[in-house]
């Protein structure tokens, strides 16, 4: 059993709970998720099985799309509604136009400080473990990209918005930063991941609908999961070299390929893996046979 299942994660379970459930149903040891969703969050969580766990990082690096709701005037220690309330104030007098302009200003490349309640490690310890002990440490800002952000509804103190962003973006931190910029704080109230790369809600499967009898129906082959990468067909000679880890410098192959592009590599219609052209030649970066 190899491939990817586009699971819709329900509320109140962890991403690892989803992995554990799929492991039990599939009876496969190698199962991995492609990007943590907080327990309170719902949405798209692609799960890789068997040999396809090798492509976890490629899916994890894809752009993400979320639909979120924040509450203005509220600050919690976790930056979401499940945390301890640190501050609360009236947000009813702020102008809707001011809120919309503020949220729109986050579009582009920004530096984001991750929340204390996160799985990031500092000196070998998870931040959430330190936070639970009441310890707050300085976190280094990380460069992220907000490709698009759109306000969907304003019903103060609540604001709903849609965001398309890069890997590593914390929507809880984004909500906190929006509130901070407005001078009154904000907390994430709801979160749904609507897309991870090519995986969307429209083609996701509810976790509770997957069982031992039907799981095979929902498995997407690795090559289809990686369909964003262009395809290249190679002959048996180059295939043998690449499978053995050789960096091919032959111009007959190199002239067809742009530098640094990642490609799906096929030989006689059989998917071999992902390849990339570098200064040293063309090589397989992820062998999948």
Swiss-Prot record:
Catalytic reaction equation(s): uridine(55) in tRNA = pseudouridine(55) in tRNA
EC code: 5.4.99.25
Broadest EC class assigned to this enzyme: isomerase
GO MF term set: RNA binding; tRNA pseudouridine(55) synthase activity
Location of the active site: 38
Top-level taxon: Bacteria
One GO process term, biological-process aspect: mRNA pseudouridine synthesis
Alphabetically ordered keywords of this record: Isomerase, tRNA processing
Function: Responsible for synthesis of pseudouridine from uracil-55 in the psi GC loop of transfer RNAs.
NCBIfam families in UniProt: TruB
Protein family: Belongs to the pseudouridine synthase TruB family. Type 1 subfamily.
Protein name as catalogued: tRNA pseudouridine synthase B
Native organism: Clostridium tetani (strain Massachusetts / E88)
């Amino acid at each position: 059993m190899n491939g990817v299942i586009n699971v819709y994660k329900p509320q109140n379970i962890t991403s690892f709970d989803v992995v554990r459930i799929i492991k039990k149903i599939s009876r496969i040891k190698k199962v991995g998720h492609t990007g943590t969703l907080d327990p309170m969050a719902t949405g798209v969580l692609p799960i890789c099985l068997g040999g396809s766990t090798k492509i976890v990082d490629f899916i994890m690096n894809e752009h993400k799309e979320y639909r979120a709701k924040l509450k203005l005037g509220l600050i919690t220690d976790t930056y979401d509604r499940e945390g301890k309330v640190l501050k609360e104030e009236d947000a009813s007098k702020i102008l809707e136009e001011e809120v919309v302009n503020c949220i729109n200003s986050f579009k582009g490349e920004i530096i984001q400080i991750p929340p204390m309640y996160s799985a990031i490690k500092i000196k070998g310890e998870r931040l959430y473990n330190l936070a639970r002990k009441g310890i707050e440490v300085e976190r280094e800002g990380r460069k992220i990209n907000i490709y698009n952000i759109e306000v969907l509804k304003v019903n103060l103190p609540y604001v709903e918005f849609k965001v398309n962003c890069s890997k590593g973006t914390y929507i809880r931190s984004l909500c906190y930063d929006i509130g901070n910029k407005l001078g009154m704080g904000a907390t994430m109230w709801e979160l749904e991941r609507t897309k991870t790369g090519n995986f969307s809600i429209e083609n996701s499967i509810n976790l509770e609908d997957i069982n031992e009898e039907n799981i095979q129906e929902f498995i997407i082959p690795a090559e289809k999961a990686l369909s964003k990468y262009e395809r290249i067909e190679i002959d048996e000679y180059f295939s043998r070299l690449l499978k053995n880890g050789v960096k091919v410098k032959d111009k007959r192959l190199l002239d067809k390929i742009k530098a640094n592009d990642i490609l799906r590599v096929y030989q006689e219609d059989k998917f071999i893996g992902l390849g990339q052209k570098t200064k040293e030649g063309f090589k397989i970066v992820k062998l999948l046979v």
